[in-house]
Swiss-Prot record:
Entry comment describing in which tissues the protein is expressed: Expressed in roots, stems, flowers and leaves.
Protein's UniProt name: Vesicle transport v-SNARE 12
Cytoplasmic side: 2-199
Alphabetical keyword list: Acetylation, Cell membrane, Coiled coil, Golgi apparatus, Membrane, Protein transport, Transmembrane, Transmembrane helix, Transport
Gene that encodes the chain: VTI12
Major place of residence: Golgi
Length: 222
């Protein structure tokens, strides 16, 4: 997962916790400068949370598909959490609350805030934990994939070296074949030359024998 996304994530979780506390504090205050200041702080914090959500969204969409899916799933939980904070802020900052209903609003707001926030953050924590586990599995799968890729590359390199060795041996054998062919041609030429010489010698011998016979016959006749 992206370190940038995790940085935004930590900032948002801290900000969300602080905003939840401030909403609870503001809900028990009477109308006055203190409450107005608290509401202004909450409004500023919610704006900051909106910015962090947008940054996380942009960062998540720039990641690889496997990491992108995990980050977008987390982001949905954070958006849901922020929407709940906005509802609490709207209820706390409502200027239309009547004095007669302020006690009821404060009690119901506090109860709802505690119940919803606890439930929301419980589900959020569980979702984040599951997503972290998924991230760990994805990282482990990626590590195994990289190791497998390295082994594959090593095998390909070994096969390439073996191929080069075989090609070199083939070239040597081809050279030996050429030498053998040349030797055969030389031996064939020598054999033909020897055969031709043999016929020449035989012809000379026959001619000499005939000459000797003729000479002897001539002498005997005279």
């Amino acid at each position: 997962m992206s370190d940038v996304f995790e940085g935004y994530e930590r900032q948002y979780c801290e900000l969300s916790t602080n905003l939840s506390r401030k909403c609870h504090s503001a809900s028990v205050l009477s109308n006055g400068e203190e409450k107005k200041g608290k509401i202004a702080e909450i409004k500023s914090g919610i704006d900051e949370a909106d910015v962090l959500i947008r940054k996380m969204d942009l960062e998540a969409r720039s990641l690889q598909p496997s990491a992108k899916a995990v980050c977008l799933s987390k982001l949905r939980e954070y958006k849901s959490d922020l929407n709940q904070l906005k509802k609490e802020f709207k209820r706390v900052s409502s200027a239309d609350a009547k004095p007669s209903s302020r006690e009821e609003l404060m009690e119901s707001g506090m109860a709802d805030l505690h119940a919803v926030s606890a439930d929301q953050r419980g589900r959020l924590a569980m979702s984040v934990e599951r997503l972290d586990q998924s991230s760990d599995r994805i990282r482990e799968s990626r590590r195994l994939m990289l190791e497998t890729e390295e082994v594959g590359i090593s095998i390909v390199q070994d096969l390439s070296q073996q191929r080069q060795t075989l090609l070199h041996a083939h070239n040597k054998l081809h050279g030996v074949d050429d030498a053998i062919d040349k030797s055969k041609k030389v031996l064939t030429a020598m054999s033909r030359r020897m055969t031709r010489n043999k016929w020449i010698i035989t012809s000379v011998i026959v001619a000499l024998v005939l000459a000797i016979i003729l000479i002897i016959s001539y002498k005997l006749s005279h």
